[in-house]
Amino acid sequence: STYFDWVHYTESQRQREDTILKALLREIWQNNYKAYGAPRLRLALSDLNLHHGTNQVRRLMREASIYSVMTRRFNKPTTTVDYRQRPNLIRHLPEANAWSMDITYLKLSNGQWVYLASVLDLQTRKILAHQISATMDTKLVVTTLQRSLSTDKKPNYLHTDMASQFTSFGFENLLKRHKIDHSYSKLGHPYDNAKIESFHSLLKCEMIYQFRFPSIAHLILDVSKYIHWFNNERISLANPKIKVA
């Protein structure tokens, strides 16, 4: 019947459109470290002037076996702090001109630990500098911060935890020379430095755990590529017009 033919045609047309959308979603997903779930993929389609609901995108993802990568945990080496608590100067200053800095552990294919130091602008949420080293020492954090200070307007505050690298004479002296006040997380409260911790978690979830790194050189290259993507292309759910997490 004419009605049957119309229904059959409509379904076939929808199937063809779904097939095209699935291919496009897969391309966007693969080009963004397989990091995007339905909300970010929907926004990516909107950037292409293709407007579809989150539920539809979620259905197409499920049918195409497209899944956002998931976080997994690992047990990292621990460090000790032998200093008294120092003040958190930015706790009640959410709009302060402040940077945050932290060190995280990354593992090569052979099981060797290496160390990534990163500096985050707390206002723009962008990574200003980073460095990877086989040793977790004062030189790592000093040279990483110097990179930030050489290319960006200096902050009023720098917030870190109380690891020995950040309380070392060399690091504290660098801050004093640049007239930057040092703010510290409370001992045993890593969430005081949540934004830089969140970035390192995203890095591991969205990139590190998907690949193997036979050498520190391979890791340095891939982390640099990821950070460029994070700063310039990653879709923000908080503000979709801003391409940063």
Label the predicted regions.
Residues 77-81, 160-162, 168-172, 182-204, ...:
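RNase H-like two-metal-ion nuclease catalytic core shared by retroviral integrases
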Residues 11, 23, 176-180, 202-245:
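C-terminal domain-tail junction helix/linker
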Residues 3, 25, 41, 57, ...:
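Mobile genetic element proteins and their domesticated derivatives, centered on retroelements
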Residues 95-128, 134-135:
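An active-site-proximal beta-strand-loop segment
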Residues 2-96, 189, 244-245:
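Basic, flexible linker segments flanking DNA-binding modules
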Residues 68, 181-182:
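Hydrophobic beta-strand scaffold residues
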Residues 145, 152-167, 240-243:
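Acidic/histidine-rich, metal-coordinating catalytic segments
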Residues 112, 130-152, 167:
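Active-site beta-loop-alpha junctions of metal-dependent nucleic acid enzymes
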